[in-house]
């Protein structure tokens, strides 16, 4: 764990992140712009991405109303596995054991849960618009939040032993042992970071701030031995330009924050808690998690999703301005610099499946979501997803 006296080191220069592989196939989404005499305009971004546990396949969802599966060894779509829907896809995610695929479709209530082997699809929480989701490390539980409640389901039985409410929920994450649930939420006066006991359904600890700048697109990650969490939750003076680590028992900050010069829109943590990736309006940064040292800073136009591969050797991202998935090797010198540090843990990939607005929007337009995840998925992956997804 980083010492509380640790100071961030920012010595990396800006550089270009060159893709090793670019996945193409998702189509632009055409819509009528009422302010331009009904002219057709196109939105090209991919809402959400998630790795399968072995790192050989990836799944993605888009505004083109499709969920697509990709063979990363060939760099091509597995066309037979394509799924087509009536509305845009907001979230997708894969469980750590590869047994379950979950997704959320715009305009449809509930979470779709598909068993990969049998193809059986069930819907959880058919009465609510789902905003953020997470799958437990042992692939048995699914956590989901609508605008005013959080629930946890057993993936096998569909039973829902956990339910809380009362806030507008932005992000959530189950601890590695599934005993604790961290949630970020807000009400009319404050924003809150909370840790709940899953079995007793009691609030363990809460931290509040008067900041009104929401960070619904930034997921919550649990780190080593489920003792600390990482997310964006700052005082009004910070303008949400930093990421902090919190002690899960007290919610006191641990070590120095990770600083950006503009609003943070995405976050990913490696499976060994050694490497942290973060994104803002035009930049993706790589950090040494323990020392807080900035290892690299890359110029990337409007990154929308961010995901580290299960082996933490590659970085995948999408942009707001095209329908491509770019997969890049993490530079060898960066891998070498952190190779000696190892803190085993599992971090969800689900977070990376969070749908995000471009960060130049000053406020979030709140309507059902996507799937940082965040957000968080297989703990053998990184996540990219939870949070309330703005409507665009």
Predicted regions located by residue number:
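WD40-repeat beta-propeller superdomains and closely related acidic/aromatic-rich repeat-like regions
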Residues: 1-392
């Amino acid at each position: 764990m980083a010492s509380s006296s640790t100071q961030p080191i920012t010595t990396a220069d800006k550089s270009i992140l060159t893709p090793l592989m670019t996945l193409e196939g998702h189509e632009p989404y055409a819509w009528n712009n009422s302010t331009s005499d009904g002219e057709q305009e196109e939105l090209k971004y991919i809402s959400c991405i998630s790795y399968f546990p072995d790192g050989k396949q990836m799944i993605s969802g888009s505004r083109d109303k499709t969920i697509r599966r990709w063979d990363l060894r060939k760099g091509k779509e597995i066309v037979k596995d394509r799924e087509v829907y009536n509305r845009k896809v907001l979230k997708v995610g894969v469980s750590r054991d590869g047994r379950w695929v979950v997704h959320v479709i715009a305009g449809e209530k509930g979470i779709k849960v598909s068993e990969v082997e049998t193809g059986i699809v069930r819907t959880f929480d058919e009465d609510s618009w789902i905003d953020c989701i997470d799958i437990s490390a042992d692939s048995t539980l699914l956590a989901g939040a609508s605008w005013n409640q959080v629930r946890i389901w057993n993936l096998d039985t569909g039973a829902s032993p956990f339910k809380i409410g009362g806030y507008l929920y932005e992000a959530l994450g189950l601890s590695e042992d599934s005993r604790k649930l961290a949630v970020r939420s807000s009400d009319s006066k404050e924003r809150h970071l909370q840790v709940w006991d899953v079995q007793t359904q009691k609030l363990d600890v809460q931290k509040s701030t008067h900041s009104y700048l929401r960070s619904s697109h930034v997921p919550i990650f649990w780190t080593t031995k489920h003792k600390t969490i990482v997310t964006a939750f700052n005082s009004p003076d910070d303008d949400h330009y930093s990421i902090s680590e919190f002690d899960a028992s007290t919610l006191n900050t641990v070590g120095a924050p990770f600083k950006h010069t503009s609003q943070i829109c995405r976050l990913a943590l490696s499976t060994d808690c050694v490497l942290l990736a973060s994104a803002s309006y035009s930049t993706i940064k790589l950090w040494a998690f323990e020392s807080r040292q900035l290892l690299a800073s890359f110029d990337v136009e409007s990154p929308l999703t961010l995901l580290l591969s299960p082996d933490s050797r590659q970085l995948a991202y999408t942009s707001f301005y095209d329908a491509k998935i770019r997969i890049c090797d993490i530079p060898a010198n960066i891998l070498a610099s952190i190779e000696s540090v190892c803190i085993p843990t599992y971090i969800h990939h689900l977070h990376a499946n969070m749908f995000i607005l471009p960060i130049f929007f000053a406020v979030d337009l709140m309507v059902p979501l996507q799937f940082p995840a965040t957000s968080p998925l297989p703990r053998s992956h990184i996540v990219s997803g939870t949070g309330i997804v703005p409507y665009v």
